[in-house]
A protein has these predicted regions:
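Interhelical loop and adjacent transmembrane-helix boundary motif
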Residues: 1-4, 34, 47-58, 204-230
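Short hydrophobic faces within alpha-helices
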Residues: 60, 85, 103, 164-172
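Transmembrane alpha-helices
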Residues: 10, 15-22, 137, 144, ...
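Transmembrane-helix boundary motif in ABC transporter permease subunits
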Residues: 2-3, 68-101, 121-122, 163, ...
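A structural signal for multi-pass alpha-helical bundles of membrane permease subunits
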Residues: 19-34, 62, 113-127, 197-202, ...
Length: 230
């Protein structure tokens, strides 16, 4: 019989600490009673009422749409930034560029949201766009910080690649774009998928940035839930 050592015990405690509250939340979502401390039996009336709330259902669809757009654009921009940082060792402004790519990772979301709000207001006054804040401005705001996560993930993968494989393909006559599409992309595909899923989750979970750059009729799910709880 396998002994319970300290590592196994701490692993189980950590997993329970993370997942037990989620399990309790799911179970109590079927509670017929309005009180959390009183169990009134199993019921799905809260889920039926949720589907009847058209405003909440609309915010779910809107959040999923924004998250999908954010994941796609973040993977694209983050991958390009990662290639620049890993494949071009020296160029003027490299330190500044690297700092700008990773800045959203450490910058408070309140500062980022306020800065983007001021930017959108100034752009509307100068060039007339955006005329109003909505899904597009939320998408831009989410992409601005999700791209940093993708860049970090993809950069780590690119640094581990064996460049001799790409060099061998080019020695055999393959064009750089063909090497990129047929060799590099398949090798970094797991990191692209991880970055895309991370961007999707971050966009779906964001409340602060969306609160700054959203407008009438563009309420996301976190904003709707926060408003209901408050």
């Amino acid at each position: 019989m396998k002994r319970w050592n300290f590592s196994n015990v701490m692993l189980i405690v950590g997993l329970l600490f993370i997942y037990l509250p989620m399990l309790i939340l799911v179970i109590y979502s079927f509670n017929a009673s309005k009180l959390v401390t009183v169990w009134g039996g199993w019921s799905v009336k809260w889920y039926v009422g949720l589907l009847d709330n058209t405003q909440l259902v609309s915010s779910v669809g809107r959040s999923l749409e924004i998250a999908f757009y954010t994941a796609f654009s973040s993977v694209l921009l983050g991958t390009l930034a990662a290639f620049v940082l890993t494949r071009i060792p020296r160029f003027r402004g490299r330190t500044l560029f690297g700092g700008m790519v990773t800045a959203p990772l450490v910058m408070p979301e309140v500062i980022t949201g306020l800065s983007l709000l001021l930017l959108f207001v100034a752009m509307a006054q100068l060039i007339g766009w955006p005329q109003e804040r909505g899904i597009v401005t939320i998408w831009i705001a989410h992409t601005s910080f999700c791209s940093s996560y993708v860049a970090v993930v993809v950069s780590a993968r690119l640094r581990e690649l064996d460049l001799s494989i790409e060099e061998a393909a080019m020695d055999l006559g393959a064009k750089p774009w063909k090497v990129f599409l047929l060799i590099t992309i398949p090798m970094i595909a797991p990191s692209l998928a991880a970055g895309g899923m991370m961007s999707f989750a971050l966009s779906l979970d964001d409340l602060v940035l969306a609160s700054f750059v959203s407008g009438p009729g563009s309420t996301t799910l976190p904003m709707e839930v926060f408003s209901a709880v408050r």
